[in-house]
């Protein structure tokens, strides 16, 4: 892939240049230098554990799945021993339950409440901090903090598509986010193909899974049977190739290749949900006055859980804070949601004063105007907005109702 030309523009030129360099490196990783069939290798569970060790030795902070507070969440891990061995989960709308699988699978779950969004688009980002001094103030901190290199362990295909979408949001165009660019600058991704579908997943409908096809350095398929516990590995980048060379790997046997393909095929056949996307943009644009909006508004709490759990939602706001003595002030950027009244507040009131208008705005943007804005849907089919909605609202059911119910 050819390196893109850097356009010299006014404003934050340094940030724009850095962001475009990050995006070029990431897109380069999406194009393996050899066919996947030639890059297919197998490593044992012990060698997988060694892979995590060498990433730590190289200075990466490992972030991966672990069990905490009754859920499989993303957090800093020290190695394979922190992974959710033997755990899976049951998910339905408004319901999540951690379950024991009865085996030693490390990645035997679908997706938890956390996406990888927070790793790059942090929930809170300090912009500057100052202290009062001699009738004026002194800036204590300003600008983007240096970030350690990050290794994502166990990223699923839907979430890799979500990261690619957020790259478009934060790294392309004139408004480049410097904090996001700094976090994305050095990232190593160990993807895992899904071995089971969650009860609310519909990645097949969205074309985003269950097999990882982009944005990874290494993609693993976990196999656990009478021939042992092992991982079939696809290499997606030169850093990935180098890492595998350091731990050693064996050529994948035809039996393991077939077993790995069967794992992904079985997952695709057992999706918990489906959402046909044919004509979905036109459907949403034509449904502004659909009676279904009143129905969903009667159930929606406007709590913003769906937008917080969503791996692509990117609304934020800026706050100024002071300490109780008024001596120290800071400005921070934090996550916001289009479901809050303040999000659309302008002089004279809120543009979206009702829950009806806020839900309609969210769904229309996610599935329609997002396509016009960024060239892709804003939904990757992870199902988190269904699982973590306390009112048990199901986005796939709402879209189906818009298709079937009569318009006013």
Predicted feature residues:
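Tryptophan (W) side chains
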Residues: 24-26
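Iron-sulfur-associated redox domains of electron-transfer enzymes in respiratory
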Residues: 30-285, 290-293, 324
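Ferredoxin-type iron-sulfur electron-transfer modules in oxidoreductases and energy-metabolism complexes
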Residues: 277-298, 316-408
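Extended amphipathic alpha-helical segments enriched in small hydrophobics
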Residues: 297-307
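A donor-sugar binding/catalytic signature common to diverse glycosyltransferases
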Residues: 305-312, 316-321
């Amino acid at each position: 892939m050819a390196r893109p030309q850097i356009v010299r523009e006014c404003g934050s030129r340094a940030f724009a240049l850095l962001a475009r360099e990050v995006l070029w490196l990431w897109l380069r990783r999406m194009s393996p230098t050899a066919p996947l069939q030639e890059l297919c290798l197998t490593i044992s569970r012990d060698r997988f554990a060694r892979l995590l060790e060498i990433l730590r030795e190289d200075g990466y902070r490992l972030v991966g799945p672990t069990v905490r507070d009754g859920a499989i969440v993303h957090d800093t891990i020290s190695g394979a021993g922190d992974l959710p061995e033997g755990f899976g989960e049951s998910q339905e709308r408004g319901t999540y339950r951690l379950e024991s699988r009865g085996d030693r699978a490390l990645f035997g779950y679908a997706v938890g409440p956390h996406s990888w969004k927070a790793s790059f688009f942090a929930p809170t980002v300090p912009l500057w901090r100052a202290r009062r001094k001699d009738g004026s103030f002194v800036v204590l901190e300003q600008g983007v903090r240096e970030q350690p290199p990050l290794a994502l362990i166990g990223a699923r295909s839907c979430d890799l598509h979500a990261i690619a979408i957020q790259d478009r949001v934060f790294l392309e165009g004139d408004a480049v986010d410097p904090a996001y660019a700094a976090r994305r600058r050095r990232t190593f991704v160990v993807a895992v193909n899904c071995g089971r579908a969650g009860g609310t997943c519909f990645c097949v409908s969205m074309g985003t899974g269950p097999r990882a096809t982009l944005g990874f350095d290494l993609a693993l398929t976990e196999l656990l049977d009478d021939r042992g516990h092992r991982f079939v590995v696809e290499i997606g980048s030169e850093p990935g190739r180098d890492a595998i060379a350091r731990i050693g790997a064996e050529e994948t046997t035809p039996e393991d290749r077939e077993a790995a393909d069967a794992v992904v095929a079985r997952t695709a056949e057992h999706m918990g949900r489906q959402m046909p996307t044919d004509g979905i943009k036109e459907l949403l644009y034509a449904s502004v006055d659909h009676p279904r909006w009143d129905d969903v508004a009667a159930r929606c709490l406007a709590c913003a859980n769906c937008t917080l759990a969503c791996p692509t939602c990117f609304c934020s706001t800026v706050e100024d804070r002071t300490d109780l003595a008024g001596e120290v002030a800071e400005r921070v950027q934090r996550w916001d949601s289009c479901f809050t009244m303040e999000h659309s507040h302008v002089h004279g009131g809120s543009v979206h004063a009702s829950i009806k208008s806020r839900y309609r705005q969210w769904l229309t943007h996610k599935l329609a105007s997002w396509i016009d804005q960024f060239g892709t849907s804003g939904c990757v089919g992870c199902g988190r907005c269904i699982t973590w909605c306390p009112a048990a609202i199901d986005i796939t059911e709402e879209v189906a109702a818009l298709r079937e119910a009569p318009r006013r």
